[in-house]
């Protein structure tokens, strides 16, 4: 990922370029420009369900048959002077909560950092809401026009300031039909032609600035760069979309080759989640590692287009069974086994997440949504043995309807080197970046984990799901887990601390976030809190070791492991754009209230309070406040 810091397993992710975990300085790849320095700094708030019920004004909103009207009236009531528009990606989650997303507008232009999400409960009333609308003095109406030369110059500024590996000297902007954006032609080095449009964005001082939002997909990074529209040289912020018959594979639950043997699985797909199976998109049957959810292949040359022509196995009878040896020194010799493993793990995880609520309406990854809502056309491009780097992996998540990319690299920390596609924890970590990016702020807004704290939580959610899924039947709350131990060749893994409920093994608390300016160590703290919640709920409800959950008549997972995974997922959909630890905690508590009536509040609060995120915890970007107290009467 060259001229700047890349988000990846082993490097420190830039705004939404995400990757596998990394242990501080080990495996760090640096660029000339640090994208973390350009992360947006936008204040956000989350009003949880308890606060909504206590507010005498909010319940006065008339209950109506149309929840969209209730949501719109709330936004107008909270911010009566604001202009806004409803984004088209609203949906009803599997817990019955409807999610509506609004974008602030000023002088007819979007405020890209101004988002308002409203959650409407099953009873038709406001459940909770999040808000990052700009509340300061509005600038005068712009005199600048949507000028083609200015749009092209904005791209040149982005290339120069960020040292992007592309050429824009001859760039020419052309109005995009049916849109107020410009397509910029006559460039080289980008996967697709860049685009630019005028928007407003908050600068580092909290002022609203007119800017060109320049979108560039340069393979390793997919960037939104906000270039000041007045002087054309200052970059205010950067968002990166970059923090799968029969298959002979390491089966679900086997995290890496040290934990078990490869087996041959027959038709392991879940028909409810993948109604076409794993080798059809509903119109065409495929005899290769291609289907509705993903397209898997090698990418040794680090190419950025032509994915359909990349090397992948083909089998007329759909028998994807290929040899693999840990002793093999030439990783290309087992490429087909690697492709098959990545295709299997990714599809299996797609199906599990669909069962838990990450479905078509919520913005999951499918070519054909089959009338189930959301936008299709976005299966995952699954690159194994990717030639774009080593000792790393990443997942690039654009908005719903555009296909994301997973790039799995070879790791050279051992001899022979190791293929990260055989480490299920790494694959799940990467795919979970797509989950958290699509759910937070709505499927059409992939830039809602762009602050340093929310980006860190993105890493934490990815570690959490990778860890929860690999729990073994004999595990107890005394069981500790590393992240990336096999691929790194180090039993400590690549995180600062093991995931453990022991405060001696892992002493991290909320205020430790103050000492970090990178997302992976922040994510280690967030995932440590979720690990506490996980074991509290397992101790209460037991642990289902099957590959998918059982649900009661109300759609609640019957065991603690899958219940925690469900609540964390639902919390992502409730929380505001760019959440903090505090607002994300509140969203998980609200998710339990929506799903179970709040029957697990005590266990959830105990898990967070143990590590300093109790009732009195306070967020400040430089000086956070610990609290180990529980709310009165919660237990």
From Swiss-Prot:
Which species is this UniProt entry from?
Answer: Leptosphaeria maculans (strain JN3 / isolate v23.1.3 / race Av1-4-5-6-7-8) (Blackleg fungus)
| UniProt: Zn(2+) binding residues | 429, 433
Residues spanning the signal sequence = 1-19
Give the induction note: Expression is controlled by the prtT transcription factor.
Gene Ontology BP, a term = proteolysis
Protein name as annotated: Extracellular metalloproteinase MEP
What is the first-listed, main subcellular location in coarse terms? secreted
Propeptide positions: 20-244
Which cysteines pair up through disulfides? They are: none
Q: Which PANTHER family match?
A: EXTRACELLULAR METALLOPROTEINASE MEP
